[in-house]
Amino acid sequence: MRTLVLLSSVAILSTLAVKCKYDGKDLENNEVITVQNAFRIKCLTEDNGSWKTEIIGCVTPDGTEINAGEKKEVGDKVHECVKSESGQVSLKESKGRTAACPGGQKHGEQWQEKSFKFRCGDGGVVKFEACVGQDGSVIPAGETGKIGGFDVKCEQHANGTITMQAANDPKSYDCTAKDGSSKKNGEEYVEGNFVRKCGDYGQGKIIGCHAENVGNTIGINQNVTSGDIVYSCTKDGSNYSFKTYSLKAN
C-alpha cells in the first residue's frame, strides 16, 4: 500500500503541469518571451518537475530576432547576439556595409576636400581615392602622375597623413627660358629687362631687372643711376615693371 501511495504520488507529480518562473511570471514549457526589449528567453521543463529558463536569442530595436551566436545586417547596422561560455548573452551593434560616413555622405558617395578626393566605403569608413591638381588633373592614391608638367606622387601614409608632392628632388628640375634654353637650379638668366633665377620644381623667379648700361642686376624696388638715366625696377603685388627716367632738363 505504501508502495502504491508512493507510486501514486509519483504519478501525481509527473502529471502536474510544471511551469517556469521568471520575474514573477509563470511560463509554459517551450514558451518564449522577450525581456528588456532585447533578449528572448525560453522556458524548458522536465518530467521530474525541474525547469529552467534559457536565453536563446536577441531582439534588435526594430524587432528583428537573432539566434544566440548569430548576427544579422539590418539596414545600415549589423547586430550580433553574442553568447559567452558562461552563458552570458549580449547584443552588440556595429555599422553595416551601407552605413553613412561621419560627414553624412552616403555609402559609395564621392566628394572632394581641397586637393583630395574621398569615397564613403563599406561600414561608413572614409576611403582616400585620389589627389587633384589645380588644372583638374587626377592622380589615384598611391600612384605618380603629371600635374603642370611635373611628376607628382599622391600618397596616404601609415599614420593617415595624405601628401601630394614632387616625386623627384625639387632641385632636380631645370627651368626653360623663353628662348628654349635650359637652366639649372640656382642659375640666373636674363629675359628681356628682367633677371630670373631658376628655383625649385623648375620655376624661374624674377629677382631683379637688367639694363645694358648697368653692370649688375638692379634689385627689386631699387633705382640705379647711370649717366643721366635712372633705371627703376619695381614690384607691385604680383606685377613687375622696369622703367627709365632721364635726368636731363627738357
From Swiss-Prot:
Query: Is Aminoacyl-tRNA synthetase set as a keyword in this record?
Result: no
Kindly give the InterPro entries that the UniProt entry links to this protein.
Mig-18-like, Mig18_Fn1
Q: Which GO terms describe its cellular component?
A: extracellular region
Q: Which UniProt keywords apply?
A: Glycoprotein, Secreted, Signal
Q: Does the keyword Signal apply?
A: yes
- Where's it mainly located? secreted
- Sites carrying a glycan are N48, N159, N223, N239
Give the signal peptide range: 1-17
Q: Which locations, inside or outside the cell, does it occupy?
A: Secreted
PANTHER family annotated for this entry? PROTEIN CBG04538-RELATED
What is the recorded name of this protein? Uncharacterized protein ZC412.3
The source organism is Caenorhabditis elegans
